[in-house]
């Protein structure tokens, strides 16, 4: 049996069309297009690629993007002052600071400085807290994108065993909260987890985000399980791969996301969905 591929690219396109239609509705009502401020500090090549793809997606959806490309020498205070200005600007709906940041800047201080209503990444403790108490406002992009993928493929987590491998603030923890919200029974695995293979083998829905190539072995996957691979790693050969052994897992799973073309496009599309939501909240 070979798993059905979950086509994140196609679902992301569909979501972008939906966002574009939402922008069109705003314009028809005489409102302005949503605006996203994107702040890049330094010249990390991977970050520059991510920022470029976000700008391109904004253009496609009719969202205005405002770029702040700052030198690597930017101080924390300078960055916080820029964020303060954007928080106060009624013409800006979303503020995104591309991570990682240079070592002189504390990322948590930066995340917490963003107005929670404009925190389109969904990283602010206020937004994570709201998700935890079943009152989501700005939902973290990757976990929300994963839930959209499941929905599109008719996969309902309710009553299922969801296993999350990785407990990062960006993916693992908020993903567990999203699954709880969808009424799954949730297990989170991390570096202190014993018998990882056993935990993975129990999963009806498996979400992996650890940043280690082929970390989860295909033979661990429960037959018929849904496998969502959030990892994206570049091997020495230049090839991209995920955190799950794809070929072996594909033979056992019911559904699986490829890398690339699975979760990645959903993260960007969800960012724009959040920006539109923010604009509509702020009227």
From Swiss-Prot:
<dbReference type="GO" id="GO:0004477">
    <property type="term" value="F:methenyltetrahydrofolate cyclohydrolase activity"/>
</dbReference>
<dbReference type="InterPro" id="IPR000672">
    <property type="entry name" value="THF_DH/CycHdrlase"/>
</dbReference>
<dbReference type="Pfam" id="PF02882">
    <property type="entry name" value="THF_DHG_CYH_C"/>
</dbReference>
<comment type="pathway">
    <text>One-carbon metabolism; tetrahydrofolate interconversion.</text>
</comment>
<dbReference type="GO" id="GO:0006164">
    <property type="term" value="P:purine nucleotide biosynthetic process"/>
</dbReference>
<dbReference type="GO" id="GO:0035999">
    <property type="term" value="P:tetrahydrofolate interconversion"/>
</dbReference>
<keyword id="KW-0486">Methionine biosynthesis</keyword>
<feature type="binding site">
    <location>
        <position position="191"/>
    </location>
    <ligand>
        <name>NADP(+)</name>
    </ligand>
</feature>
<dbReference type="GO" id="GO:0009086">
    <property type="term" value="P:methionine biosynthetic process"/>
</dbReference>
<comment type="subunit">
    <text>Homodimer.</text>
</comment>
<dbReference type="InterPro" id="IPR020867">
    <property type="entry name" value="THF_DH/CycHdrlase_CS"/>
</dbReference>
<dbReference type="InterPro" id="IPR046346">
    <property type="entry name" value="Aminoacid_DH-like_N_sf"/>
</dbReference>
<dbReference type="InterPro" id="IPR020630">
    <property type="entry name" value="THF_DH/CycHdrlase_cat_dom"/>
</dbReference>
<dbReference type="InterPro" id="IPR036291">
    <property type="entry name" value="NAD(P)-bd_dom_sf"/>
</dbReference>
<keyword id="KW-0378">Hydrolase</keyword>
<feature type="binding site">
    <location>
        <position position="232"/>
    </location>
    <ligand>
        <name>NADP(+)</name>
    </ligand>
</feature>
<dbReference type="Pfam" id="PF00763">
    <property type="entry name" value="THF_DHG_CYH"/>
</dbReference>
<dbReference type="GO" id="GO:0005829">
    <property type="term" value="C:cytosol"/>
</dbReference>
<dbReference type="GO" id="GO:0000105">
    <property type="term" value="P:L-histidine biosynthetic process"/>
</dbReference>
<keyword id="KW-0560">Oxidoreductase</keyword>
<comment type="similarity">
    <text>Belongs to the tetrahydrofolate dehydrogenase/cyclohydrolase family.</text>
</comment>
<dbReference type="InterPro" id="IPR020631">
    <property type="entry name" value="THF_DH/CycHdrlase_NAD-bd_dom"/>
</dbReference>
<keyword id="KW-0368">Histidine biosynthesis</keyword>
<keyword id="KW-0028">Amino-acid biosynthesis</keyword>
<comment type="function">
    <text>Catalyzes the oxidation of 5,10-methylenetetrahydrofolate to 5,10-methenyltetrahydrofolate and then the hydrolysis of 5,10-methenyltetrahydrofolate to 10-formyltetrahydrofolate.</text>
</comment>
<feature type="binding site">
    <location>
        <begin position="166"/>
        <end position="168"/>
    </location>
    <ligand>
        <name>NADP(+)</name>
    </ligand>
</feature>
<keyword id="KW-0658">Purine biosynthesis</keyword>
<keyword id="KW-0511">Multifunctional enzyme</keyword>
<keyword id="KW-0521">NADP</keyword>
<protein>
    <recommendedName>
        <fullName>Bifunctional protein FolD</fullName>
        <ecNumber>1.5.1.5</ecNumber>
        <ecNumber>3.5.4.9</ecNumber>
    </recommendedName>
</protein>
<dbReference type="GO" id="GO:0004488">
    <property type="term" value="F:methylenetetrahydrofolate dehydrogenase (NADP+) activity"/>
</dbReference>
<keyword id="KW-0554">One-carbon metabolism</keyword>
């Amino acid at each position: 049996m070979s798993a059905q591929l979950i086509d994140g690219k196609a679902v992301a396109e569909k979501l972008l069309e939906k966002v574009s239609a939402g922008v069109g509705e705003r314009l028809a009502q005489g409102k302005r297009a949503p605006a996203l401020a994107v702040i890049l500090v330094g010249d990390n090549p991977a970050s520059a690629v991510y920022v470029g793809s976000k700008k391109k997606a904004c253009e496609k959806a009719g969202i205005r993007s405002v770029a702040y490309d700052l030198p690597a020498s930017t101080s924390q205070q300078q960055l916080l002052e820029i964020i303060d200005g954007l928080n106060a600007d009624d013409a800006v709906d979303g503020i995104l600071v591309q991570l990682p940041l240079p070592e002189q800047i504390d990322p948590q201080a930066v995340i917490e400085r963003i107005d929670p209503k404009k925190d389109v990444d969904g990283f602010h403790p206020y937004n994570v807290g709201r998700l935890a108490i079943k009152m989501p406002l700005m939902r973290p992009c990757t976990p929300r994108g994963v839930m959209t993928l499941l929905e599109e493929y008719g996969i309902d987590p309710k009553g299922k065993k969801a296993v999350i491998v990785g407990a990062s603030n960006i993916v693992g923890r908020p993903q567990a909260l999203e699954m709880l919200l969808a009424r799954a029974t949730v297990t989170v695995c991390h570096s202190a987890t014993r018998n990882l293979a056993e935990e993975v083998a129990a999963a009806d829905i498996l979400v992996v985000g650890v940043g280690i190539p082929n970390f989860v072995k295909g033979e661990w996957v429960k037959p018929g399980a849904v496998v969502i691979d959030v990892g994206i790693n570049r091997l020495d050969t230049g090839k991209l791969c995920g955190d799950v052994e794809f070929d072996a897992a594909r033979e056992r799973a019911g559904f699986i996301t490829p890398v690339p073309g699975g979760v990645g496009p959903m993260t960007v599309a969800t960012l724009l969905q959040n920006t539109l939501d923010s604009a509509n909240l702020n009227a």
